[in-house]
Regions:
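C-terminal capping alpha-helices of c-type cytochrome domains
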Residues: 54, 140-159, 163-184, 278-335
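Short glycine/threonine-rich turn/loop motifs
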Residues: 21-128, 189-297, 329-335
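Sec-dependent N-terminal signal peptides
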Residues: 5-12
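Short sequence/structural segments immediately N-terminal
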Residues: 109, 136-141
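Short His/Asp/Glu-rich catalytic/ion-coordination signatures at enzyme active sites or charged loops
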Residues: 135, 180, 187-189, 199-200
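C-terminal motif of bacterial Sec signal peptides marking the signal peptidase cleavage site
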Residues: 14-16
């Protein structure tokens, strides 16, 4: 009897140990949330583990800048939804940046890039900070020369694209990694798409109703699954703008001081706000729109004084904070 019990206990312990040793199922490289379309990858840059790994390594490597002082992650920190906490991020040599670093969350869905929309693909956008004097202040061919002397990069480049490090693998691998930065599991998403009615508080629900109402017109610019129309708007931040915005690209006078509408996903962790980081907090942003902004001939006519009460402003802020995706901002896969 004792022998049988001992055998049974031994088998039970063996089964328990084997159960504990079962490897965890790795998280997929690309997870598309409910309510989101699948992002498109170019035919010459489809997602593979090798390309993801190479792009991620380059994203965090200061080898990308002339003096090896800054990387992509220096201005796009993962815990801040891949944005920065300062108005304008310092570049190589400590030179001040010209514009606020936007979040990279859901960058895969953007139809064009930079604040004025002058870059048509994510692969091409990778070149912008490299060449910009106030950012990396470098040349992509010189970066490639650096990478060719690194045996790890040479091996990873061959595994990812079947070629040695060059401009092609730099732009494509980083773009491939960035397309996986998809955020869509905020408490708002849990409420809206996952059927969790208790995911939002009463204040957040009131703020949501206000956000989508004609009283605020927030959703006229911040709509869709990514809370942006990607249109170019003047929001009355100044009467005279130091930055010409989209006019810099088109030289059309009606585009003066118009900038691409940003996503509001994770907006609570991406302060400061606006194209130049002028507004330090979400409360300041709400107050700006509540006041109707400054007078400018190209200001969107929907931006006008709202007359929000203190409670309505608090509810609106609460809703905006519910758009934070904590899992995304803490995901070790992206770090």
């Amino acid at each position: 009897m004792k022998k049988g019990v001992l055998i049974a206990l031994g088998l039970l312990l063996l089964w328990a140990c084997r159960k504990e040793q079962q490897p965890e199922v790795p998280e997929p490289l690309l997870a598309v949330p409910q309510g989101f379309p699948s992002p498109e990858f170019p035919s010459d840059n489809e997602l593979t583990p090798a390309r993801f790994a190479l792009g991620k390594r380059l994203f965090y490597d200061v080898v990308m800048s002339r003096d090896s002082s800054v990387s992509c992650a220096s201005c796009h920190a993962p815990h801040l939804a891949f944005s920065d906490s300062v108005a304008t991020s310092p570049g190589a040599g400590g030179l001040p940046g010209k514009r606020n670093a936007p979040t990279l969350a859901n960058v895969a869905y953007q139809p064009y890039f930079t604040r004025e929309g002058g870059v048509p693909t994510l692969e091409m956008q990778i070149l912008v900070p490299i060449q910009e004097h106030n950012e990396f202040d470098f040349n992509i061919l010189e970066i490639a020369d650096r990478l060719k002397t690194d045996s790890v990069y040479s091996r990873m480049s061959q595994a990812a694209y079947g070629r040695d490090p060059d401009f092609y693998i730099i732009t494509r691998s980083i773009a491939c990694f960035e397309r996986t930065l998809i955020s869509g599991d905020s408490r708002y998403d849990q409420y809206q798409f996952q059927g969790k009615s208790e995911a939002l508080t009463d204040s957040e629900k009131r703020g949501m109703d206000l956000f989508f109402s004609n009283k605020t017109n927030c959703s006229s610019c911040h709509s869709g699954f990514n809370f942006t129309t990607y249109a170019f708007e003047n929001n009355g931040l100044y009467e005279v703008y130091p930055d010409p915005g989209r006019f810099r690209l088109t030289e059309d006078s009606t585009d003066l001081a118009r900038f691409k509408v940003p996503t509001l996903r994770n907006v609570a962790v991406t302060s400061p706000y606006m194209h130049n980081g002028l507004l330090p907090s979400l409360a300041a942003v709400v107050e700006h729109y509540n006041s109707g902004g400054k007078n400018h001939p190209h200001k969107n006519p929907l931006i006008k004084p709202m007359g929000l009460t203190a409670q309505e402003k608090a509810d609106l802020l609460a809703f905006l904070e519910s758009l934070t995706d904590e899992k995304f901002n803490k995901n070790p896969k992206f770090k």
